[in-house]
Protein backbone atom coordinates (compact mmCIF):
# COMPACT_ATOMS: atom_id res chain seq x y z
CA UNK A 1 0.00 0.00 0.00
CA UNK A 2 1.29 3.47 -0.89
CA UNK A 3 2.20 5.68 2.00
CA UNK A 4 1.00 9.24 2.45
CA UNK A 5 4.36 10.64 1.24
CA UNK A 6 4.03 8.87 -2.13
CA UNK A 7 0.46 10.06 -2.60
CA UNK A 8 1.47 13.64 -1.74
CA UNK A 9 4.36 13.46 -4.24
CA UNK A 10 1.97 12.33 -7.00
CA UNK A 11 -0.51 15.02 -6.00
CA UNK A 12 2.27 17.61 -6.30
CA UNK A 13 3.24 16.33 -9.77
CA UNK A 14 -0.42 16.50 -10.82
CA UNK A 15 -0.67 20.07 -9.51
CA UNK A 16 2.47 21.02 -11.47
CA UNK A 17 0.77 19.71 -14.61
CA UNK A 18 -2.31 21.86 -14.04
CA UNK A 19 -0.12 24.85 -13.17
CA UNK A 20 1.71 24.44 -16.48
CA UNK A 21 -1.62 24.19 -18.28
CA UNK A 22 -3.14 27.24 -16.61
CA UNK A 23 -0.02 29.36 -17.12
CA UNK A 24 0.59 28.12 -20.69
CA UNK A 25 4.11 27.31 -19.50
CA UNK A 26 5.83 25.00 -21.97
CA UNK A 27 9.00 24.81 -19.85
CA UNK A 28 6.98 23.57 -16.88
CA UNK A 29 5.14 21.12 -19.15
CA UNK A 30 8.59 19.86 -20.24
CA UNK A 31 9.45 19.29 -16.58
CA UNK A 32 6.21 17.41 -15.85
CA UNK A 33 6.34 14.87 -18.68
CA UNK A 34 8.61 11.89 -19.21
CA UNK A 35 10.39 12.40 -22.53
CA UNK A 36 9.87 9.02 -24.19
CA UNK A 37 8.57 7.98 -27.59
CA UNK A 38 5.76 5.93 -26.04
CA UNK A 39 4.03 8.54 -23.82
CA UNK A 40 0.47 9.34 -24.87
CA UNK A 41 -1.96 12.24 -24.73
CA UNK A 42 -5.58 12.71 -25.77
CA UNK A 43 -6.96 16.24 -25.65
CA UNK A 44 -10.75 16.70 -25.80
CA UNK A 45 -11.83 16.18 -29.41
CA UNK A 46 -8.32 15.23 -30.59
CA UNK A 47 -6.93 11.93 -31.83
CA UNK A 48 -4.40 9.96 -29.82
CA UNK A 49 -0.96 11.60 -29.76
CA UNK A 50 2.02 9.29 -29.23
CA UNK A 51 5.59 10.24 -28.34
CA UNK A 52 6.97 13.13 -26.35
CA UNK A 53 7.89 15.30 -29.35
CA UNK A 54 4.33 15.15 -30.72
CA UNK A 55 2.80 15.56 -27.26
CA UNK A 56 5.00 18.61 -26.65
CA UNK A 57 4.02 20.06 -30.03
CA UNK A 58 0.34 19.65 -29.12
CA UNK A 59 0.84 21.70 -25.94
CA UNK A 60 2.77 24.29 -27.93
CA UNK A 61 -0.17 24.59 -30.35
CA UNK A 62 -2.68 24.90 -27.51
CA UNK A 63 -0.60 27.54 -25.72
CA UNK A 64 -0.04 29.49 -28.96
CA UNK A 65 -3.82 29.81 -29.34
CA UNK A 66 -3.63 32.82 -27.07
CA UNK A 67 -6.69 32.07 -24.96
CA UNK A 68 -6.08 32.53 -21.27
CA UNK A 69 -7.30 29.77 -19.03
CA UNK A 70 -8.16 29.00 -15.45
CA UNK A 71 -8.26 25.33 -14.54
CA UNK A 72 -9.11 23.65 -11.27
CA UNK A 73 -8.85 19.93 -10.67
CA UNK A 74 -11.62 18.60 -8.47
CA UNK A 75 -12.65 15.24 -7.04
CA UNK A 76 -9.02 14.12 -7.39
CA UNK A 77 -8.42 10.43 -6.68
CA UNK A 78 -4.90 8.98 -6.58
CA UNK A 79 -3.81 5.35 -6.59
CA UNK A 80 -0.12 4.44 -6.39
CA UNK A 81 0.99 0.95 -7.42
CA UNK A 82 4.75 0.50 -7.22
CA UNK A 83 6.39 3.00 -9.57
CA UNK A 84 3.12 3.92 -11.29
CA UNK A 85 0.28 6.21 -10.25
CA UNK A 86 -3.21 6.74 -11.57
CA UNK A 87 -4.93 10.07 -11.04
CA UNK A 88 -8.55 10.64 -11.98
CA UNK A 89 -10.27 13.97 -11.63
CA UNK A 90 -12.55 16.56 -13.13
CA UNK A 91 -11.06 19.62 -14.80
CA UNK A 92 -13.17 22.74 -14.37
CA UNK A 93 -12.10 25.20 -17.06
CA UNK A 94 -12.73 28.88 -17.68
CA UNK A 95 -11.32 29.90 -21.07
CA UNK A 96 -10.82 33.61 -21.74
CA UNK A 97 -10.97 34.28 -25.48
CA UNK A 98 -10.20 37.99 -25.01
CA UNK A 99 -10.11 40.61 -22.26
CA UNK A 100 -13.70 41.76 -22.88
CA UNK A 101 -15.85 38.66 -23.34
CA UNK A 102 -17.08 36.46 -20.54
CA UNK A 103 -15.09 33.25 -20.18
CA UNK A 104 -16.31 30.03 -21.75
CA UNK A 105 -16.81 27.34 -19.12
CA UNK A 106 -16.22 23.66 -19.68
CA UNK A 107 -15.85 20.55 -17.59
CA UNK A 108 -13.74 17.59 -18.56
CA UNK A 109 -12.93 14.35 -16.88
CA UNK A 110 -9.28 13.36 -16.92
CA UNK A 111 -7.04 10.41 -16.27
CA UNK A 112 -3.38 11.17 -15.68
CA UNK A 113 -0.80 8.41 -15.41
CA UNK A 114 2.59 8.96 -13.80
CA UNK A 115 5.74 6.86 -13.56
CA UNK A 116 8.38 7.28 -10.88
CA UNK A 117 11.76 7.69 -12.58
CA UNK A 118 14.87 8.33 -10.47
CA UNK A 119 12.63 9.27 -7.55
CA UNK A 120 10.59 11.83 -9.54
CA UNK A 121 7.01 11.39 -10.72
CA UNK A 122 6.68 12.08 -14.46
CA UNK A 123 3.50 12.12 -16.52
CA UNK A 124 3.31 9.34 -19.09
CA UNK A 125 -0.33 9.66 -20.18
CA UNK A 126 -3.03 12.35 -20.11
CA UNK A 127 -6.55 11.78 -21.38
CA UNK A 128 -9.23 14.44 -21.04
CA UNK A 129 -12.77 14.21 -22.40
CA UNK A 130 -15.50 16.79 -22.18
CA UNK A 131 -18.27 15.86 -19.78
CA UNK A 132 -21.51 15.91 -21.77
CA UNK A 133 -24.43 17.84 -20.44
CA UNK A 134 -26.76 15.40 -18.74
CA UNK A 135 -30.03 15.14 -20.64
CA UNK A 136 -33.15 16.01 -18.72
CA UNK A 137 -34.95 12.84 -17.70
CA UNK A 138 -38.72 12.98 -17.71
CA UNK A 139 -41.19 10.58 -16.13
CA UNK A 140 -41.99 9.12 -19.57
CA UNK A 141 -38.29 8.22 -19.97
CA UNK A 142 -38.55 6.08 -16.84
CA UNK A 143 -41.64 4.14 -17.93
CA UNK A 144 -40.77 1.06 -19.95
Task: Name each model feature, range by range.
Residues 2-31, 39-144:
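A beta-strand edge to alpha-helix "cap/lid" segment located at domain peripheries
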Amino acid sequence: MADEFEIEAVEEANEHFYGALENADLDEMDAVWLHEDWVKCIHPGWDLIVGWEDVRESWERIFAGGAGMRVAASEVEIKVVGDFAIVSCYEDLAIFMDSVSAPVSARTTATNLFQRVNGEWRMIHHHASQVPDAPEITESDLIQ
